[in-house]
Amino acid sequence: MGSLLQDIRFALRTLRKNPGFTTIAVLTLALGIGANSAIFSVVNAVLVRPLPYPQPQQLMLLRETSLQGESSVSYPNFLDWKAGSRLFESMAASRSDSFNLTGSGEPERMPGRMVSAGWLETLGIRPALGRPVSPQEDKKGASPVVMISHALWQRRFAGDPNILGKSIWLNGLSHTVIAVLPENFQHYSFSPVDVYVPIGAELRVRERDNHPGISVLARLRRGATLQQARAEMATVAAAIEKQYPELNRGRGVKITPLRQNVLGDVQPALVVLLGAVGMVLLIACANLSNLLLARGAARQKEITIRQALGAGRGRLVRQLLTESLLLSLAGGMMGLALAAWLVEAVRAFPPANIPRVEQTRVDAAVIGFTLLLAVLTGLIFGLAPALRASALNLVASLKGASGRASGTLRHQRLRRGLMVSEFALTLALLVSAALLLESFAHMSGVNPGYDPHRLLSMVISLPEANYQGRKPLDFYEQLRRRAARLPQVQAVAYTNDLPFYSDDEETFLAEGMAVPKAGEFPLAVEYVVSPGYFQTMRIPLVAGRVFSESDAEGKSLYVVIDENLARRFFAGDALGKHIRFPGDDSPPPMQIIGVVGHVTHYSLDGEEVTPYQMYFAYPQIPEPFLYRAGSMMGLLVRTSGDPNALAPAVRAQVQGLDPNLPVYSVQSMEDRMAESIAPQRFSTLLIASFAALALLLAAAGLFGVISYSVSQRTQEIGIRMTLGAEQRSVLRLVVGEGLKLALAGMGVGLAASLALTRFLASQLHGVGPTDPATFAGVALLLTAVAVLACWLPARRATRVDPLVALRYE
């Protein structure tokens, strides 16, 4: 212990005597360790921590599969699954919904869920107050009840301890509060959910051919495996198909662990980020190893004297490693402070669509990770220089043979190897960043098929209790006319299906198309729109015409389709043809009056879930179906000014028609589009930042290596210049030495990049993982940086006075 304390005191004294080296080393480590700790804190919050439910590994999410792919669950099928399963301890259905909360205070749109009895018990959660939904409340005709979140209880009802049994108004209906959920409870979507109502009382979810966004939560019995559950549910699905062949042909059950379902989409991006910061730290370690090798050469006399006084190699290695560990621990402390600052930035501006990211914090796990990383980093960058510096030949050293000659030869290969590895890692990181930047630029530049500029969007939901008959149509048409009279407004329209927000789809049959088997009908995104919709959105007309004010109920039923549907099912000649819809209560065939351009509805990455689109005129919808088609509408307002500045005036028009209607999801279409690619923006900007840091470290490392080489070869350069060598040849000599190292590293890096970038393939859009232009561009950039890093010490070498150089020691 005494000798260790002595080593620490000596190391501190040595580092204090070299403030320049110590500062550079600590700052380099702080950047590398801090970046790793910050990303680990995000990974820890999002991926590592278990889901906040008892035995979360037993929780599964079930969805239906069909011949067309995955879909939501039919409610009657859910009931049959529940009755037929023996390996699941419990099973419950839920679907996302939202509700107008009215009564005391301003009307407010509440994010909510419809859940079946047993849903809360399946999660293993008990209410803070009250009780869960009972089976008697989860059926047709039951009195409406609601469970509310702790946040809503506090915000809207001031934490009223007598809230149970009181009524709140949701969508125009009185609901009795039966439970307040725990303060720390989170829905597994990790999005805010404030109200939970029984799903079984909802009439529109009870039809077997209706798939209204339901997913099924289930808990495996102890001892049951996922494979056994999948086999059992395949048998159950086959029995349902046999009983209902027309409606369940080809339908199965997809079972995924809840954690995988919730976090699976973000895991690849976060793993890539963690790998990127790991590469930055390795580059930093290589840099510091080179610095320590240079210091080791300069300290050979000191080490020789210590050997002569009896210090063994083990003691010397321990002393040198102590210095490295002190540097890494100091860098770790600064890195932890940097990580805490970065974490606060993430919490203040959390990227959208990354679950639990707002829970990121510097906790005991992050502190432990940082400490471990600091120790490992100190060993990684300090061990090789310590072993090399302590492996001196005592006799040769005392004779002075080790200085510039043998010492330099011993260190040269290791230093060059480290430099090659730095450039290899840097090129791999730069290629990855460049590919992601190109992919993001491609998504950002996608033409969505309409003009999103100066276009305001908002959502309005009508409560069924107050809007029967023609009232929905009358309301929307009045609102359209009133909003159109506002200053700077150029056009107003409404639709049931806003891009990047909602996803209504409909099966169809094209004229002349053979009736397919059940489950094989084509799907199209279904837009119910007002007159003027295409002009407001500026969707181009390809052929025919769009809806006019004269297209109303009682006239011929018209439909407008997109060019994809026209090309696939009508060979581009669709005008005058008809589209019909399967089902007994479906409308009669509709005549195609127009073909418009395809619009991007789901994602800017080019992977449209449903490639076809069709449009119906809302005024043509028969009166009994007006509420069903228009219970929720997105209002679109095109303006000549700032769309967000217009929002209060439009909201006032809604309140003027019905003061109990909340207006929500108020965004410009540009903001809505930007939000849809927020996760890609987050990961791309981070990797680009790490790549820039890696490039800076690599350039600094090469500069240091060449500068050290020049200092060691000062006498040689002086001799060359004395013998008549021109400055140009000296420049070429020094720059060439550095370029050889850089090009060797880039060669290794290119080979590594070809293998590594394949892991990015799923995150790339519009560019391949082996894009030649990207690889070539990065190689040219790195070559230019290498030339600059070598040119500065090379210029210094050409200014050496030959007489001074000949006397250089």
Task: Label the model's feature ranges.
Residues M1-I24, Y53, L67, E106-R109, ...:
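Membrane-helix entry/capping segments
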Residues A284-S328, A700-L739, M746, F759, ...:
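Interfacial "coupling" helices/loops that link adjacent transmembrane helices in transporter permeases
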Residues S98, G112-P135, P144-V271, E344, ...:
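Mid-to-C-terminal secondary-structure elements
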